[in-house]
Amino acid sequence: ALEVRGLTRAFGVRKALDAVTFDLPSRAFLSVFGPNGAGKTTLVKVLTTLLHPSSGTAKVLGLDVVDDAVEMRKRIGLISHNPLLYPDLTAEENLLFFADMYGIDQPHVRVAELLEAVELDHRKLDLTRTFSRGMLQRLSIARALLHRPEVLFLDEPYSGLDPHAMEILDGLIAQIRGDHTFVMISHDLDKGLELCSHALIMARGRIVLFEPREAIEVAAFRDTYRATVGMGVA
């Protein structure tokens, strides 16, 4: 599903990504770990076409993140820890707006289905500025799933969630993970390792470790992660 070769992204003289290379098979779940400034979010932004790489290449579903960006956006979804929603629209209006952008058939049916899945159907007519952070994140998840993406990118999706919202997100991931590829940034080692089929640790824009879950010895993995925390920004 992902083919990354020598991926580099520079901001001035600093390389937020420095020759990153890895492959991820279809229907895998990759958890990405690393300290602040390691390049995790920059990696996701490049892979979701929000940033252009300075050099190197990346393909998602065989599509180049630069040359095939328009087509690729139709087949991927992004769940951010900062929900991308309009505060002065209702929950239903938010989802219908994005459904129209994606050209979804029978948008009201799809929106109703997702509002029920994230347990917000009873709040569908309420303005989202009245929602708690957990509710906003749940609605953001519904938005990301509207067009049935094949690859889902999750940027710290559990950050700031209440226990109920965490349970809902766990359930949604369990329900769809067999048919999707996931890339999740996480600061929670336990949750990230619980979910993943592959794990990646970054520091200073580079890959420190990339292994399938079955090859990981948890204590050694924790030691490697702790060693990167003091490395800071490149």
Functional labels for PLM-detected ranges:
Residues G192-E194:
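A short, surface-exposed alpha-helical micro-motif characterized by mixed small hydrophobic
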Residues L96, D100-R123:
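Conserved ABC ATPase "signature" region
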Residues F33-P35:
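The feature captures the beta-strand-to-loop junction immediately N-terminal to the Walker
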Residues L152-D155:
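Catalytic Walker B motif of ABC-type/P-loop ATPase nucleotide-binding domains
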Residues T48:
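Helix-to-loop junction immediately C-terminal to a conserved catalytic motif
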Residues H180-I185:
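Conserved H-loop
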